[in-house]
Amino acid sequence: MADEQPQGNGQGAAQQGEQPKQQFQIAKLYLKDVSLETPNSPEVFTGEWKPQVNVDLTSKTRALQEGHYEVALTVTVTAKQGEKTAYLCEVTQAGVFQIKGFEDAARNGLLGAYCPAQLFPYVRETVNSLITQGGFPAMVLQPVNFDALYQQRLAQAAERQKAEQAQGGGAEAKGSDSTAAQGSDTQQ
């Protein structure tokens, strides 16, 4: 009985001086760019409010130093009353993420889906705040499935690469990790 020791306290590797194999950390979150344009105010406030609203979302990734990446999520919301733009709101929320010890596919998944999902609540709050401060009704952005967008982007890239190979190009598709989504709705 005296020879038995507790197993698996989760600190064995750290106590032996080894670094954990996988590390994920949010190093910094920041508002990178923000704008609200209301080109037709105050006239836009005089009529009935039944705008056509379009939401565009993009995510871009760039490598910084070893194991550090910037992910920038941009949301552009455009509301039109007929042919006139009521407002154009654009917010870019960014973060620096430390990602070490992951295989390429897992790291790319974190950068392409998980990191933008961490930034989205900040974008949602900033967009809503700007639009209401501009005198317009609240604009609550609906949830976004970043995992599905990332998988869709991977499938599109694979199809592009397959088409290029079929045409004899054979070149690999390169570019920054990004996701894009568009939506249109009528705000009431």
Swiss-Prot record:
Q: Name one GO molecular function term.
A: unfolded protein binding
Q: Domain of life, per the record?
A: Bacteria
One GO cellular component term noted in the UniProt record for this chain: cytoplasm
Chain segments carrying region Disordered: 1-21, 160-188
Task: List the InterPro entries.
Answer: SecB, SecB-like_sf
The UniProt gene name for this protein comes to: secB
- Please give the biological process terms from Gene Ontology that the record holds: protein folding; protein tetramerization; protein transport
Q: Which residues cross the membrane?
A: none
Primary localisation category: cytoplasm
Name its cellular compartments: Cytoplasm
Taxonomic lineage per UniProt? Bacteria, Pseudomonadati, Pseudomonadota, Gammaproteobacteria, Chromatiales
Fill in the subunit field for this protein: Homotetramer, a dimer of dimers. One homotetramer interacts with 1 SecA dimer.
Residue ranges annotated as compositionally biased, kind Polar residues, are 176-188
Q: What does this protein do?
A: One of the proteins required for the normal export of preproteins out of the cell cytoplasm. It is a molecular chaperone that binds to a subset of precursor proteins, maintaining them in a translocation-competent state. It also specifically binds to its receptor SecA.
User: Mind listing the UniProt keywords for this protein, alphabetically?
Assistant: Chaperone, Cytoplasm, Protein transport, Translocation, Transport
Pfam families, per the entry: SecB (PF02556)
Protein name from the UniProt record = Protein-export protein SecB
> According to its UniProt record, which protein family does this protein belong to?
Belongs to the SecB family.
